[in-house]
Amino acid sequence: MIENNAAYLQTLGQQAKQASYALAGLTGQQKQALLSAIAGSLTKNSATILAANAKDVVAARSNGLNDAMIDRLLLDESRLQGVIGDIDNVINLTDPVGTELESQVLDNGLRLSRRRVPLGVIGVIYEARPNVTVDIAVLALKTGNAVILRGGKETLQSNLALSEAIRAAVVEQGLPADSVQLIQSPDRALVSGLLKLDQFVDMIVPRGGQNLQRLCAEQATIPVILGGIGICHLYADKDADIAKSIAVIANAKVQRPTVCNALDTVLVHEAIADQLLPQLYTHLAASGVTFYGCQSAQAIADKLGVAISIATEETYGQEWLSLTLGVKVVSDIDTAIDHIRTYSSGHSEGILTDSIHASAHFVNEVDSAAVYVNASTRFTDGGQFGLGAEVAVSTQKLHARGPMGLEALTTYKWIGVGEYTARS
């Protein structure tokens, strides 16, 4: 029980800021050794971690959490080994810290350069995925940042065990344990307090649903990276290959329907709707997909005897996170683009077409973090983009956009070197 939230957070912030100074000076080789030590510590403490996770699962079941939520918080031996294996992927990534981005010699002889440096202290608020504890800590440390973690109450025991194993490795490497800190209470007031810890925390990353994103946007006095909400679209143009389009749409919808880069609405040009939609309905219905559609989409479904509900303004603006799909028939590409502009969260959109002109028009006019031509929205992922594990997927435009890898956890400083140069 934390008696004084403000004092508790103040201490966490001070400790994190102090730790960040030590981390900022690490060499690439020292960071590699640190991450290797973390992998070793997680392996060594795997029995403790799995036992803690089992307690979370038992509590989740007793509290009536659904199977999908329990699956998200579950860690078994295989999943834990996968999390540990991902650390090797991060170790092998190029360390962006210290990279010289540009340099020049000014007319007055001043040698000016711009160098990539750590942000400092990062606060991450996330929900029922214990693997995020490891992913975020490893990415933060790789870039020389301290991190304050606030996980969901459903995974508190798992997160405590994971963070203690990580901290043990940090200390083993001669670094401050407070390089990685976990808020050890489910009290929601601590989230509001963390959002105002601007004296110590340089960036907040919320990984969660709309309510968490809104809370952070409204209450934070620290820069916040918003995102993770994916209302994703695919538009099948009049020049699309129908068979190939159905395969891509099915991948985007069915492969992992509970993630933010899964497809929510498919838009179909009226010229191919009578050909594409009957095949699409049959294919997706076999996988358990249910549909909301416009009147034209509904008429085609009715002929097949496929159940479909009428789409509304509310359903078009829904991130389904399930086997549900919105369907709309449109008169042309610009109508599709207008629909996306109205309902998209700015995450991932795509066009399916064999027309170079149509694909170029779509890419130029759709303003989302990731825009695809003849590809699934499911590719919007740090691992798929070659960034390693991701911190989050940002749907805003400042600082970071799209999957956030190592570079998104850095900033830059200007360095000027003179010969006792004074400004004239």
UniProtKB/Swiss-Prot annotation:
Keywords: Amino-acid biosynthesis, Cytoplasm, NADP, Oxidoreductase, Proline biosynthesis. Pathway: Amino-acid biosynthesis; L-proline biosynthesis; L-glutamate 5-semialdehyde from L-glutamate: step 2/2. It is found in: Cytoplasm. Its EC number is 1.2.1.41. It holds the Pfam family Aldedh. The keyword Amino-acid biosynthesis applies. Its main location: cytoplasm. The keyword Hydrolase does not apply. It is an enzyme of class 1 (oxidoreductase). Gene3D superfamilies: Aldehyde Dehydrogenase, Chain A, domain 1, Aldehyde Dehydrogenase, Chain A, domain 2. Coiled coil: none annotated. InterPro entries: Ald_DH/histidinol_DH (IPR016161), Ald_DH_C (IPR016163), Ald_DH_N (IPR016162), Aldehyde_DH_dom (IPR015590), G-glutamylP_reductase_CS (IPR020593), Glu-5-SA_DH (IPR012134), GPR_dom (IPR000965). It catalyses: L-glutamate 5-semialdehyde + phosphate + NADP(+) = L-glutamyl 5-phosphate + NADPH + H(+). GO terms for cellular component: cytoplasm. GO terms for molecular function: glutamate-5-semialdehyde dehydrogenase activity; NADP binding. Catalyzes the NADPH-dependent reduction of L-glutamate 5-phosphate into L-glutamate 5-semialdehyde and phosphate. The product spontaneously undergoes cyclization to form 1-pyrroline-5-carboxylate. Belongs to the gamma-glutamyl phosphate reductase family. This is Gamma-glutamyl phosphate reductase. The gene is proA.
